[in-house]
Swiss-Prot record:
Cited Gene3D superfamilies: 3.30.70.330
Biological role: Binds to 23S rRNA.
Subcellular location: Plastid, Chloroplast
This protein's name: Large ribosomal subunit protein uL23c
SUPFAM superfamilies with a match to the protein in the record: Ribosomal proteins S24e, L23 and L15e
Gene: rpl23
Subunit structure: Part of the 50S ribosomal subunit.
Organism the protein comes from: Bigelowiella natans
Keyword annotations: Chloroplast, Plastid, Ribonucleoprotein, Ribosomal protein, RNA-binding, rRNA-binding
Length: 87
């Protein structure tokens, strides 16, 4: 189950959204919103209020002359005062 969550995305926009209890992750592209919500609630013992997903389109890399595969990004809204702790 942990291998379905790939890593947390840390950009300027995602760091600013941490103040409003929104976390951004890259997840496996086969997961749907209900599965993502269940995984995060079980792994981190938090209440997920909202799940927003976004699939990035595959893009052409001019350096390697091939397409990069698409990925799925998820933005989770959790209860205020709760934190996702990474060990």
């Amino acid at each position: 189950m942990i291998n379905l969550l790939q890593f947390q995305i840390l950009t300027e926009k995602s760091i600013n959204s941490l103040e409003s209890n929104k976390y951004t992750f890259k997840v496996d592209k086969r997961l749907n919103k209900t599965q993502i919500k269940e995984i995060f609630e079980q792994l981190f013992n938090i209440k997920v209020l909202n799940v927003n997903t976004c699939r990035s389109p595959k893009s052409f890399s001019r350096a390697s002359k091939r397409y990069k595969s698409f990925y799925k990004k998820v933005i989770l809204t959790v209860e205020s005062g709760k934190l996702i702790q990474f060990v």
